[in-house]
Amino acid sequence: MSQLCPCGSAVEYSLCCHPYVSGEKVAPDPEHLMRSRYCAFVMQDADYLIKTWHPSCGAAALRAELIAGFAHTEWLGLTVFEHCWQDADNIGFVSFVARFTEGGKTGAIIERSRFLKENGQWYYIDGTRPQFGRNDPCPCGSGKKFKKCCGQ
């Protein structure tokens, strides 16, 4: 039985993010890396998350924190609403909403992630949290106001 990819692509996991998470392939661009990293959170794969963080970030030191977080978080969905990169610059950005429940409460991470390409491989560097007004449209694309959607 085939399983849809957790990244929200509507493609089977085996044909979408699995080749990246399993190490068969390297993500070709920041959006694919972002989606595969989301899958790694869903599948509780700390090794892939650490491997795809830029080495300068010292992600290996976060292993215990990542694993502890897996036990309390259920990921509900990912919406990528903007992505841009130029291979010539070796830098890219992906803006997304990742929805989750933790301790019985629903939440969302809204982030503009920054990626760097080195030696043919994209790495996650860091992210910023954009500010939205309570009455702004929610960036997840629901059509609702931010305060009634991901801003709760």
Swiss-Prot record:
Supply the gene name.
ychJ
Reading the lineage from the top rank, the first entry is Bacteria
Q: Which PANTHER family match?
A: ADENYLATE CYCLASE-ASSOCIATED CAP C-TERMINAL DOMAIN-CONTAINING PROTEIN, UPF0225 PROTEIN SCO1677
* Annotated Gene3D superfamilies: 3.10.450.50
| Family stated for the protein in its record | Belongs to the UPF0225 family.
Q: State what protein this is by name.
A: UPF0225 protein YchJ
Name the HAMAP family for this protein: UPF0225
Q: Which InterPro entries match?
A: NTF2-like_dom_sf, SEC_C_motif, UPF0225, YchJ-like_M
